[in-house]
């Protein structure tokens, strides 16, 4: 039987420590300290959910709508809305969209949002409206705990508090089909909504509330009733919002409509079976489309381009509907011959990024619920007996990443690559660093490390990284490993190497900010990870072995993973080295000595077994106990990163790594566009900026032209919005500026600007101690400006 956390763990969770387990030996001695961070107004609110049944009954793929009216004699100067929902909400006040939330998290310490909504209020009658969704199942960003609900409190000071309770009017949105197909293996379900039943005007004042529940028709629960034992502040800013119109109509066409197209659970499958090729190229900029009447048994299709990958909430303004028209939308990032969009609904991740609406009569504006990322949208219309005007809009909804860093260069290709990288980072920064907004929206931690580096240059913001560190720490395997992404149900996505990456991001945070706090807060998680790896050592070699229970990632390529893989052991060594430094910095001297001894042991094993007689790094010990004869680029790079004794970097560099960068040799394990970041960092540090620069200009050129970075170099069937390959966002500035951080928190730097790679550039680093500016004008030597608080070691 599960027991509640001890008071120490509870307080640690409230004040920023780890919350990594839910079974304890000692019951809680409850104290108000546990809920000290919960605003008093929110403590007075109730969790609410419309009946039938209790607030955990029959909620699979469910939407609910809530309305609360109140009057004001005057608009208060400040009106703080505290709000959360399980799983997610959209908030409107007086018909205007306010925000979406909460951030992903765990019910045992559920996040709530805080927003000043005074600008949305008015004298007289006011309306709070919220739409809430719960998938009723797990996804790659949500762990279902058997409950759904809305909790809010609007604190207006002397004007009073409006809170969620049984006075709120609510109803299940029965016009939303419940048995729709998932968007993908990783995400929730398609939204199919019949607007004849679900009037979008419900968010406005004056709407008739006939048929809405109130009082006995709403289930309620105390704010801290299980599973919501504790709460935490969002810890990151609310999303930034703006409306983006469609940019152009790419193509259009028409065809037969499948006979049973009125009753489908997977709109992506329907569209695919009907055919997605379009016959007429259009290529015109426009903000809306006009659909001619469609004959019975026929459909008309339109391929819309938003100009580049966008992320947010799809909105549709409809004019001239007679009621009953069906509009299916399928989202994609690219199209093929005959304007056929990428729609692999039955392969891989089973990506079926589609929605459906059935129109009501008249003119109206409606919006779908799920945040979605895409560039192209196929709009398929059927059953329209009269002309129909459709205006698609995207409400951008993403982390408000500020442009504090600057990269301007005279090379047009380099500039486009950098801007594509920056844009990719922005569409992959939501309530967490996500791999791609397209098919997953999962907080993969190998990706997140690269994204943090990107963000350090683009904005200098570390809050997404800090929140992500805690999120990963909060979901562990009993043996100490963390999950590859979190929160999640994906037990097949436990990646031992990503647990080591998580440790390295503790160091990254320290190196960027000078703060050791995350390491101190999560040291118990670190100890669990190290315990796992020590238990996985081969007694003969002292090297870490492959564990077939888990997915050992290492790289998206043919690198050795079974036996005793070199790359895994190198990552373990690097983690131990960084832990030793952090322990010394935080005065954990006994632990520092322990980690130092463990590092010394694994370093000796690597030198003995993973460096061959010629001084090259090999890929590992094979399952049969023999040494591999393969010398991957990854192994050479990691041996250099770890300064392994006996490794001949000059030989490996000249015969393997540089020939690869120059395109002179092929290799058995080509570094992916993700893992290339480690190649680039290592070779730039070794003085080979030119080779890295030219490699990026060649291999990222297509990405620069497209406007965002791909999952890998071959864009075919791959995501076109993958931030793990957006590292030119910081690598290109490093190459040209020659800025190298040499002290934690940017306390010191060295600068050696390029004088030959480009004639003109301007680069600005937004460090915690002020901006570093490196600028080169045509025909002149570079100039460098460094804040007085940063020690220049030139």
Regions found by a protein language model. Name each.
Residues 6-7, 439, 444, 600:
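Short amphipathic alpha-helical "recognition" segments used for binding
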Residues 22-438, 447, 463-464, 482-488, ...:
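Extracellular/oxidizing-compartment recognition motifs
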Residues 8-15:
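Bacterial N-terminal signal peptides
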Residues 1-4:
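Positively charged n-region of N-terminal signal peptides that target proteins for export
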Residues 444-459, 463-794:
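Active-site core of glycosidic bond-cleaving carbohydrate-active enzymes
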